[in-house]
């Protein structure tokens, strides 16, 4: 299973770790993924989904159905 948000498609970012002496090494910044069981109002069922915390924040603000439609995700497959 890859570390990708099932709702937004967010995945790891390539970055640099910089030491005190300014030596740079490559670093992989992973997405903060959480497994959640969310209630889908329109489908009248629970949805088990692995989402990023940013997506979870968006869901709390505008709702699961609206976030899924914006990102083109079919919640029936979960």
Curated annotation (Swiss-Prot):
Q: Does the keyword Ribonucleoprotein apply?
A: yes
Domain of life per record: Bacteria
Q: A single Gene Ontology molecular function, please?
A: structural constituent of ribosome
What are the record keywords, sorted?
Ribonucleoprotein, Ribosomal protein
One Pfam family here: Ribosomal_L28
- Which SUPFAM superfamilies does this chain map to? L28p-like
**Can you quote a single GO CC term?**
ribonucleoprotein complex
Q: Which family does it belong to?
A: Belongs to the bacterial ribosomal protein bL28 family.
Q: What is this protein called?
A: Large ribosomal subunit protein bL28
């Amino acid at each position: 299973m890859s570390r990708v948000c099932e709702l937004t498609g967010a995945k790891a970012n390539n970055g640099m770790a910089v030491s005190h002496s300014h030596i740079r090494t490559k670093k992989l910044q992973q997405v903060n993924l959480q497994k959640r069981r969310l209630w889908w109002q329109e489908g009248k069922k629970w949805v088990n989904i692995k989402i990023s915390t940013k997506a979870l924040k968006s869901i709390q603000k505008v709702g699961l159905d609206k976030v899924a439609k914006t990102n083109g995700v079919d919640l029936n497959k979960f």
